[in-house]
């Protein structure tokens, strides 16, 4: 393969990895926002539990709230895992980009 073709291939690879890195950066930001939103929902549900009175069919309402809280906690866990995976891929792409530049 000629040097020109190698260089062109390297440029294409660099552009592809750089775009992927930026996309991952945006996804990480989006996931962090989702984590914050769900943490706020958990706090809201915790506060709501404190205000429920016995004359409101307490056990049923409390059961529903606990189920909702559990769902939000599961979502946060999923987002944290996905965020970690994306961060790892982003780090690897950064290393590869540095290697291509040199």
UniProtKB/Swiss-Prot annotation:
UniProt KW Metal-binding keyword? no
Superkingdom of origin:
Bacteria
| UniProt entry tagged with the keyword Acetylation | no
Instruction: Quote the Pfam families the UniProt record gives.
Output: DUF496
Q: Any one cellular component term from GO for this entry?
A: cytosol
What's in the keyword line of the UniProt record?
Coiled coil, Cytoplasm
Quote the subcellular location field of this record: Cytoplasm
Q: State the InterPro entries in the record.
A: DUF496
Q: Which residues form a coiled coil?
A: 69-96
The protein's matches in NCBIfam families, at most eight in alphabetical order, are given as:
PRK05423.1 (NF003844)
What is its biological role? Pole-localizer protein involved in the regulation of several cellular processes.
Similarity-based family: Belongs to the pole-localizer TmaR family.
What HAMAP family would the database entry show? Answer: Pole_loc_TmaR
**What is the recorded name of this protein?**
Pole-localizer protein TmaR
Query: From what organism does this protein derive?
Result: Buchnera aphidicola subsp. Acyrthosiphon pisum (strain APS) (Acyrthosiphon pisum symbiotic bacterium)
């Amino acid at each position: 393969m000629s040097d020109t073709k190698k260089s062109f291939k390297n440029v294409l690879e660099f552009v592809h990895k750089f775009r992927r890195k930026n996309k991952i950066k945006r996804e990480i930001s989006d996931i962090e926002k989702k984590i914050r939103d769900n943490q706020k929902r958990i706090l809201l549900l915790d506060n709501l539990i404190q205000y429920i009175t016995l004359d409101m069919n307490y056990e049923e309402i409390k059961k529903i709230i606990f189920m909702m809280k559990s769902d939000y906690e599961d979502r946060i866990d999923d987002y944290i895992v996905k965020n970690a995976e994306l961060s790892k891929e982003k780090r690897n792409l950064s290393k590869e980009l540095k290697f291509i530049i040199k």
